[in-house]
Amino acid sequence: MPFLSDNRTLAAGAVVANVLDGKFNRVLQENSKVTVAQVCDGDVASTIIIGRELLMDDQLTLIESVAGGSPRNPEDIIAQSVGRAGEEVIVKVRNTDAANAQTVKTNVYIEPL
C-alpha cells in the first residue's frame, strides 16, 4: 500500500498548488481507494481532487489534537474516495492567516482495489 506524506510550514497567505508534487505515487498506478488525513496548527484551508472529482473545496483543515502530532487514521481523515489508474491526487493548501505562518501535515494512504 503506497503511503505519501508531507509536513511543511506555510508563510502567511501562502498557497501550495499540490503538496504531493514530485512524489511518484501521486499518479495512481491502478484503481485505488485514496484516503487523505490532515492536521494543522492554525488557519489552513485545503482543496482535494482525485482525477476530475473534487472532494473538498477550500475548506478549513482540522486543528491537530496533540501539539506537534501527525495526522491519525481514522481520526483525522478529511476525504476518502476511489480513483482510477492514471488519475492524479492533488492536495492544495492555503494559509488563510494574513499575519502568521502555519504548519500543515498531510498523510495519503493509497490502497489498490
Predicted regions and their residues:
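Beta-strand-centric surfaces of beta-sandwich/beta-rich domains
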Residues: 1-113
